[in-house]
Amino acid sequence: MALTHNLGFPRIGARRELKFALESYWKGESSRDALEAVGADLRRRHWQDQAALDLVPVGDFAFYDQVLDMSFTLGNLPERVQGFDGHPLDNAFRVARGRSADIAETHCCSAACSGVAAGEMTKWFDTNYHYIVPEFAASTSFKLDASRLLAQLAEAQAAGVRAKPVIIGPVTYLALGKAKDGSDKLGLLDRLLPVYVELLEALAGAGAEWVQIDEPLLVTELNAEWQHAFNRAYHALKASRVKLLLATYFGQLLENRYLAATLPVAGLHVDAISGRDDVEPLLGLLPAHKVLSLGVVNGRNIWKTDLGATLDWLEPVAERLGERLWIAPSCSLLHVPVDLDSEDALDGEIKSWLAFAKQKLDELRVLVAALNHGRDTVSAELAANRAACDARRNSPRVNDPAVKAAVAAITPQSGARQSPYAVRAAKQAAHLRLPRFPTTTIGSFPQTAEIRQARRRFKAGEIDDAAYRAAMQDEIAHSVRAQEALGLDVLVHGEAERNDMVEYFGEQLDGYAFSRFGWVQSYGSRCVKPPILFGDVRRPRPMTVEWTRYGQSLTEKPMKGMLTGPVTLLNWSFVRDDQPRAESCKQLALTIRDEVADLEKAGVRVIQIDEAALREGLPLRRSQWKTYLGWAVESFRIAANGVADETQIHTHMCYSEFNDIIEAIAAMDADVITIETSRSDMELLDAFDHFSYPNEIGPGVYDIHSPNIPTPQHIVNLIKKAAERIPAERLWINPDCGLKTRQWNEVIPALGNMVAAARTLRAGWQETGRAG
C-alpha cells in the first residue's frame, strides 16, 4: 500500500493572516502572545487541511523564514544580536529586518543606522521565495535549541496529527550560508554534525518516527568535496533512532543519483516533475529496504495534474515498490496559494484547469486511492480531471495565431539599438543634462492605506473611474512634490496605481488571468499574487503612458517610465506548461516593446525595464545556463531596443548575485543598471574586478527591506567603495529596490540622506576629481 505525505504547507494563511499579524506586532499594535496565537491557529488549521495524509509535516511553519529558524535551532546567531536579552523571536526578527519592531531599539550595533544590520537575503534555489543567509566564520560554533520545533511537534501530537518533523539537512545548510571571513564553510561540518545528532535524538525522544531532512543541494552540480561531505554527514547521522527521509527537489539528481541512493537513510524523496528521468535508474540503485517517495504533483505551479497520465506512469512503479512507495508533491507547497475554493471571481473555465495547495493534496488522495484500490474506486474524480485537462488543451483561448506570427517574425535586428553605447551616452548626456552622481529611486513609493482603500473601493464599484483617477493623480502629485523637495535628479511617478509590479501589467494583457486570494510568500510578511499566464499574450492598449505623462506634466525634471521586463513577468507568474518558457517570454517581450515605443512617443526619455527576476530563472545546474541566458537576454533586447539613441534605457535587478552572469548582463546593453548591493556591503561589485562593465550602474546604497535609516556618511562610504571599481562618471546613487513596502516617515529621511551624500560626493569630485 502506497502512502501519502507532504513536504510543507503554505504558512501565510488563506487570507494572509500571518502577514497581518506580523505587521501588527512590528508596529507595536499587538503583543507577542497575540502573534503566537495566530501562528498556533494557522498550524492547527493547516494540519486539519492535511488530515487525509499518512504523514503530515511539522516544523514547516516559520514566522519569518525556515532557514532563519534552522539557524536559531542550531544556535548559529550573528554576534550583533547576541547582546540582546529579549525573546528569541525578537532576535530572529532583528536578524531578518534589522530590528524586532518598527520602533527605536535601545541598542545600536551598526555604524550605518539605528538597530542592527539586517541579515543578507537571497533566493531559495530558483524560486521566488527568499531566505535569510546563515552567517559563518572560522570561529563559528553551534549549540542546539530545539525548543520551538519540539513545541510544535508536541502541539501536533496533542492534536492527533501523524507528525513528520521537517528540518534542513546539514550539507545544504552550510551551502546556503556565507563565510563572512572567507573561511571554508565545509570546515564547520565536524562541529555541526554533533548538534544534528543531538537534534535527531531529541526528536526521537519526543516520539517522532520519521524526520524529513531536506537536502535540495543534491540536485545541483557538486564537486568531490561536497559529495564527500554528504557521505560524512549521513554516516554520522545513521545511528539515529528516527528514520530519515532525505528530501530532494527542484531538479534532477543526474550524476548524484548513486550518492543519493546509497546514503544511509531510510527513504529518499525525488522530484518526479522536474526529475522524472531519475526514477528508473533509482529503482535499480535503491536498496530493497529503502522507501522511495515520488513528488508526482507539481508543488511549484498551479495547473491540475493530469491524473490519468500520472497513473499510467506510476502504476508500474507501484507494482515494483509495493509498500516502499510514497507519493507527495514535488516540493513544499509553500510556493503555491492555499485554496482554490476561495476564488469566487476567477473565470470559471480557467479555474477548472487549476489546483492550489489544498486541491493538490486532494489529487494525492485520488492517486493513492487508485493505486491502492483501483481506478474504479475514484472513477468520477478521474473523469472530471480528464475533462478539465482536455478542455485546457483544446481551448481557443489558449492559442492566438496573430501572436504566434509576430513571434515568428522576430529577427536579430529586433534586439539591436541604433548606435553603440558610447554614442548613445553622449546624446543622452546632452539631452538629460544630469549632474555627476545622479540620484533616482527604483520606482515605487509607499503604498499607503489611503491608496489601498481607493483601489479596493474602485474594484468594488464604490467609486467611479473619475474619482479613482483623481485619487491616483493626487498621490502621484504628492510623490513628485516630495522628490522635488528632496532634490532627486530623475523622478518617478510613484506607481500609486499599481498593486504589484507583475499583476498590474498582467491585468492589462490578454492571455493572463488573476486570482483574488492566490497569495504566496516572498519573504517575511511580503506576499505576492502571481498572475496566471494561461495563453498567448497580447497588449490591447497602452498600460502606463497616461500615468507617466501626468507625472511628467508636474515637473521639469526627467520622469522615468516604469515597466516590468519580459523575463520578470515570466518568472514571477504561474506560467503555462504547454509550450517552452522561451516562447512565452518572447511574446511578453513584444508587448513591452510596444509599451516602450508608446512611452517614447509621449515624450518620456528615461524608461526603466525592471528585470528583478533575471537570475531567478537560472537553472540550478550551471551547464544549462547558456541556453536560458540566451533567450532571456534576447527577450530583454527585443523589449528595450526599439527606441532612439537619446532615450535612456534603465534596468533594475534585485538580490542578484550576478558576478557569474556579468557578461550576459552586459549583453543586455541597458544604458543604466541599478542593482541590490547594500546588504552585501558592495560585495556584488567584485565582478567588476575582472570585467570592464561598459555602461552606467547604480549600486543600491541602502536596504529598503529594513526600516533602518542610513546616514549620509554610510552612503558616501559605499559609493567610494563602488568608485574603486566603477568610474565615478558612470555611477548613479539609488536605493536597493522600490519603496512601496516602507512608510513615508522612513522614506523621506533615508532619501534625504541619500541626496546629501550625493552632494558631498559632487563637492569632493569638483575639488579633487575623485568621489568624495
UniProtKB/Swiss-Prot annotation:
It comes from the Bacteria. Binds 1 zinc ion per subunit. The keyword Repeat applies. It is an enzyme of class 2 (transferase). Zn(2+) binds at residues 652, 654, 676, 737. GO terms for biological process: methionine biosynthetic process; methylation. One of its GO terms (molecular function) is 5-methyltetrahydropteroyltriglutamate-homocysteine S-methyltransferase activity. Pathway: Amino-acid biosynthesis; L-methionine biosynthesis via de novo pathway; L-methionine from L-homocysteine (MetE route): step 1/1. PANTHER family: 5-METHYLTETRAHYDROPTEROYLTRIGLUTAMATE--HOMOCYSTEINE METHYLTRANSFERASE. NCBIfam families: met_syn_B12ind (TIGR01371), PRK05222.1 (NF003556). This is 5-methyltetrahydropteroyltriglutamate--homocysteine methyltransferase. The gene is metE.
